[in-house]
């Protein structure tokens, strides 16, 4: 896996998402309900469904550590596995590494621009779902943010240096106008 271009001509990106990617690869399996659903589509033969029923990733993963600067056209993750196994994990790896690397990179740029002043993450209200909020806050922390308004992320990572960063609700704005 590699990327071709750094967003906004930034020179480099910050690797993030590896922890979730490895966890996904380790735990990927197909439940009976999954197999039954695929069987109901009428396009998969029994041999393939049996393969999925017993699936366990057998490949090797080589990756750049999280928080490391990465550059265009250089491998950030390599999967050495049978093609079918690599294909089964490809989409999740792309969406996870791309999403978190983008956020970690932007956070890192903001932190560097702040020149030593603390930067806190408040992205949960704009995230596309609860998992994206937690993963995004985690990525911002990897990028250098000192804390998050996402209480769940703070609980999981213990990343906020303060008691609670909180957030500023839209209703507060309306009341003060």
PLM regions and their residue ranges:
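N-terminal, charged/glycine-rich beta-strand/loop interface patches
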Residues: 26, 58-60
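Buried, small/hydrophobic-residue-enriched core segments of structured protein domains
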Residues: 5-7, 43, 49-58, 66-177
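Intrinsically disordered, low-complexity, positively charged segments
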Residues: 1-43
């Amino acid at each position: 896996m590699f990327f071709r271009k750094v967003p906004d001509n930034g020179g480099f990106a910050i690797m993030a998402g590896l922890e979730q990617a490895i966890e996904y690869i380790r735990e990927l399996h197909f439940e009976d309900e999954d197999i039954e659903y695929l069987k109901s589509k009428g396009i998969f033969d029994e041999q393939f469904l049996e393969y999925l029923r017993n699936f366990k990733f057998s490949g090797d993963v080589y990756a750049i550590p999280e928080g490391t600067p990465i550059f265009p056209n250089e491998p950030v993750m390599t999967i050495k596995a049978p093609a079918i196994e690599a294909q089964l994990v490809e989409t999740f790896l792309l969406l996870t590494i791309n999403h978190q690397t983008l956020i970690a990179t932007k956070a890192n740029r903001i932190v560097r621009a702040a020149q030593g002043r603390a930067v806190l993450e408040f992205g949960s209200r704009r995230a596309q779902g609860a998992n994206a909020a937690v993963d995004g806050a985690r990525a911002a922390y990897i990028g250098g943010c000192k804390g998050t308004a996402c209480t769940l992320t703070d609980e999981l990572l213990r990343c906020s240096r303060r008691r609670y960063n909180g957030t500023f609700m839209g209703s507060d704005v309306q009341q003060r106008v």
